Amino acid sequence: MDKQYQPTLTEVQDWVLKLYNTCEQTITKAERLEQHKYAVMVQRPQDKKFLVKMLDESSQIRDRKILAKRIKTLLDQYGVPEFLNKRDAFLFKMYQAFGHHFDFIAIPIIKKRLRMDTSQVIINEERPQLTKHLATRFKEKIGQNVNLLGEVVLGNEEADHRYHHYLEALESPDINYISVKISGIYAQTHALNYEESFPELVSRMSALYQKAIDFPYTDEDGIKRSKFINLDMEEYKDAHFTLRLFKAVLNLPQFKNYSAGIVVQAYLPDAYDFQTELLEFAKARVDGGGAPIKMRLVKGCNLEMETVISSLKGWPNPIRPSKTEVDANYLCLLERGLMPENARVLHLGVASHNLFSIAYAYLLAQKYGTTGYMTFEMLEGMANHLWRAQSMLGNRVILYTPVVKNEHFLNAVSYLVRRMDENTAPDNFLTHSFNLKPDTKEWDFLAKQFEEAYAMKDHLTHVSPRVQNRNLPYTPVAPSDTMQNEPDTDFDLSQNQEWVRRIFAKWKKSGTEEPEIIPLQIGAETVVCKNRYKYLDRCQNDEVCICEMSQADSAQVEKIIEIAETDPAGWRKTTLEERHRIMYEAANRLADMRGDLIGCMCAVTGKTVIEGDVEVSEAVDYARFYTTAMKKFAALDDIEIKPKGTILVISPWNFPCAIPVGGIVAGLAGGNTVILKPATVAAPVAWMFAKAFWDAGVPKEALQVIITNREALKVLTTAPAIKHIILTGGTDTAQNIARANPVTPLSAETGGKNVIILTASGDRDHAIMNIVASAFGNAGQKCSACSLLLVERSVYEDKNFQSKLKDAATSLKVGSVWNPGNIVGPMITNKNDKLLQAFNL
């Protein structure tokens, strides 16, 4: 048999027409009306916006009066949707006119109607409703891939609840196929916690597989079979980990003869490699006497989220850049997946509503004789006439079926909103399928879309754009007049996880090494002082000395000030263009020493790797920003730029890299000499990044780094030679400096207490995620940490909100930063009288 068989465009188009005609025979009057509603909505973006916002806000706002006013506002803003029938349009107009005043009547009716109208898409999990639905589909010989919707998993308690929910569902005689998400059964998975979370996830997936075996179902032929579990792919960040988990569990001897499935997303360039890995695994498994497995091929549904995350982090988008490429990759994966030698070991679920993709898969399977290894999979409640037509044509069909209990229905609305948004996107097949007819512009658009994908499928590259490797030398960025942010580290990549392990190997001291002695810098000279500050590893019970740093006395401080004032190296005489070049070089060197800066922050201040990483990115941005911005000012008419003299930068310990770098670059960019006095407890970090500036071309006389005692610090802050002081620190420190030296300009960013306000209209689940991140990020040691939560009464009295907030907070992993899975590291010191006083209130 020719393994390179490809259906021709004519064959595909002929079969699409056959499938379309069958669909037309099966579609009901109610379904045609529903299709017409969608067709109208697609033509009127304001109708879609209204519906999406109303659905979303109805799921978030618990207060009837507030929700009633909000729906009225949406109607005023977007108008009554035209896709509504006459009765519903009239009711909305009456609501807009006066009904919103009767919220106690209107809102329960709206929510009940919402549940009723979505009952075909989101199935009620309560019995006997679910029993009836599953029995109907079983009689129709339509498979049901049950997706259990519920509360958002924010902590361990909810994850445990969802996990046991899956186990209970598998005991139900009429549920024989479920989809499981890692995020639904375990709350603490993140890139640097994979190794620690892996055994627990193996245990949980094993228990689910065993439950599927222990509670078999009886098929239509009276044969008992193990239930099927499909492992869903979610965000790109967990894709490789999910595949690894899937293989590891099925490799256990007790599951040798158990068949399970996993999703592969065609919009990822990695999908081809995922399929390759699955094929190799499946062939070895079957050759060893084991059962085949299944790949559920989808196009992908997290495009917007992946795009936003990539943009925020400065990473390449992991998604293929066009819909045509995604469709082409889908066809490519179908071609390989349906070859006999592949399909027999790796069964294929073709998950698509696209008639052309379906036709292509059907023709391939017919040619290869692999239809018995393939199922067509669609969404329950979406274009039901399509799956009926498939069934009529003899194809096996499985419907992805979200189910939810009544008390969690509003949590399921987000699923509904996402599906509706996807299915009405401009280039989505379903957008053009409503009222679809041959020889129309919609039909021609879809046919052309397929033809373009067909032409492209053999010319795709299958290389992920996410190739960042922190183990390699940094690629320098040339000086530019356009500012671009430095990307954070992509810890999802295995090579960067290895990089973290190398950082730990270097910076986690054993205590047997001689601690480094950091000298005192006085201009271009250094001297080791008898008076030194010892730095102990907070994560090793303060028992391991990392280094010692020399402290300046008053006389040495005066010498340092003199050097800065006289500027013997002539930094003030440099041109802005020269400084711009040097600052870019410093930025490159900072980026190249990212690992050491992170390691130093971990060891000295107890900052976690992820928190240290974003700080380095910010420091690199600062190094590029100030001269880039200053060049724009210099280009303005009537603007003269000249140095002020010597700038004193006093920086804090909680952001020991980004904040001091920002201060010194602000001074250096203007041609000023800078004295940096970092917080003593974090000073080794400053000593390290100062080397980047010196090596880049900043004279040591122009940038001096010191730590001092209290008496010498007063000499520094009151010296007439200091022309400007930049302080980030406590309010009392700023006040003391201002009192002691009211003449020198002081730019002070001082402490504060951050308040997060959550209204009754807010998304409480997302609020909890952000509250916890704000309150406990950097161990809460920052003025921007959420110290007070201000909520409306209805939120305050919401016991579910309180429970979920507590669950999310208490589930955070706390401990040594040398365990990369920990989210919260140690406090900088145990001697915090104010904090201890607060605990005792």
Residue locations for each model-derived region?
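Positively charged, amphipathic and often flexible ligand-engagement surfaces
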Residues: 1-487
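Structural signal for hydrophobic packing residues in well-ordered secondary-structure cores
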Residues: 138, 170, 174, 250, ...
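Generic beta-strand/beta-sheet core signal
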Residues: 147-149, 180-183, 230-234, 263-265, ...
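Conserved short loop/turn motifs at secondary-structure junctions
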Residues: 148-155, 232-237, 262-268, 352-353, ...
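Long, K/E/R/D-enriched contiguous segments that form extended
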Residues: 218, 223-225, 236, 241-250, ...
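Terminal low-complexity tails and localization/encapsulation signals of metabolic enzymes
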Residues: 406-562, 566, 573, 577-588, ...
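Rossmann-like NAD(P) dinucleotide-binding subdomain of oxidoreductase/dehydrogenase enzymes
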Residues: 602, 630-766
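ALDH superfamily catalytic-core signature
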Residues: 697, 719-720, 724, 731-841
